[in-house]
Amino acid sequence: MKMCDMFQTADWKTEKHVPAIECDDAVAADAFFPVTVSLGKEIAHPNTTEHHIRWIRCYFKPEGDKFSYEVGSFEFTAHGECAKGPNEGPVYTNHTVTFQLKIKTPGVLVASSFCNIHGLWESSKAVALK
């Protein structure tokens, strides 16, 4: 089995597990720009001890390049766990992250995520240069 066969995809507007990548469609070369990746943007994803998003990972694949590059790995480790019991804890993290990057060529941003119940999901967004 190939790793790519383990990932599910869909439209983030209709499926709560798919990462929504938000950034400008075209950016200036070699200048930092913000990217936000979230899950459940249109349909809320649960955030409980029993059902939650554990991480989001982001990559950039430059146009015409054989290789992709890891941009960031973001873990969400608090989901209401507590010695008192599930969902009794004092802290929760939310499955949204904003970071900045700069690129020298156009390419594709790819985001993957992991739901502890429903597994691996991914999405992508093309980014052009102005």
UniProtKB/Swiss-Prot annotation:
Signal peptide: none annotated. One of its GO terms (molecular function) is superoxide dismutase activity. Its cofactor is Fe cation. Fe cation binds at E15, H17, H45, H51, C115, H118. The keyword Iron applies. It is an enzyme of class 1 (oxidoreductase). Its EC number is 1.15.1.1. Pfam families: Desulfoferrodox (PF01880). The keyword ATP-binding does not apply. CDD domains: SORL_classII. Keywords: Electron transport, Iron, Metal-binding, Oxidoreductase, Transport. SUPFAM superfamilies: Superoxide reductase-like. Binds 2 iron ions per subunit. It comes from the Bacteria. It catalyses: 2 superoxide + 2 H(+) = H2O2 + O2. Has a reduction potential of +190 mV. Monomer. Belongs to the desulfoferrodoxin family. Non-heme iron protein. This is Neelaredoxin. It comes from Megalodesulfovibrio gigas (Desulfovibrio gigas).
